[in-house]
Swiss-Prot record:
Classification lineage: Bacteria, Bacillati, Actinomycetota, Actinomycetes, Mycobacteriales
NCBIfam families: S20
Superkingdom, natural source: Bacteria
UniProt KW keywords: Ribonucleoprotein, Ribosomal protein, RNA-binding, rRNA-binding
Biological role: Binds directly to 16S ribosomal RNA.
UniProt GO MF annotations: small ribosomal subunit rRNA binding; structural constituent of ribosome
Region annotation (Disordered) ranges: 1-25
GO cellular component: cytosol; small ribosomal subunit
Gene: rpsT
A GO biological process held by the record: translation
Similarity annotation: Belongs to the bacterial ribosomal protein bS20 family.
Record protein name field: Small ribosomal subunit protein bS20
Matching InterPro entries: Ribosomal_bS20, Ribosomal_bS20_sf
Matches recorded under Pfam families: Ribosomal_S20p (PF01649)
Amino acid sequence: MANIKSQQKRNKTNERARLRNKSVKSSLRTAVRAFREAAHAGDKEKAAELLVSTNRKLDKAASKGVIHKNQAANKKSALAQALNKL
């Protein structure tokens, strides 16, 4: 436990941010998994619809600093390629 008051406050802030980031990353994984399942099933319409929502979530996570912008770009590119293969 920190002795300095400002560090105690930072620890609280960091813990809140960690939990928030964990939640965002979990929802990202769920969105990507849903897209991949739709793509694997060959449902092009549903996959295209899920791609849009997944891309929005990836962009938002990148803009908030939860994931790196290049990671978001790489995931978006891979998902688009998967959709185009259908």
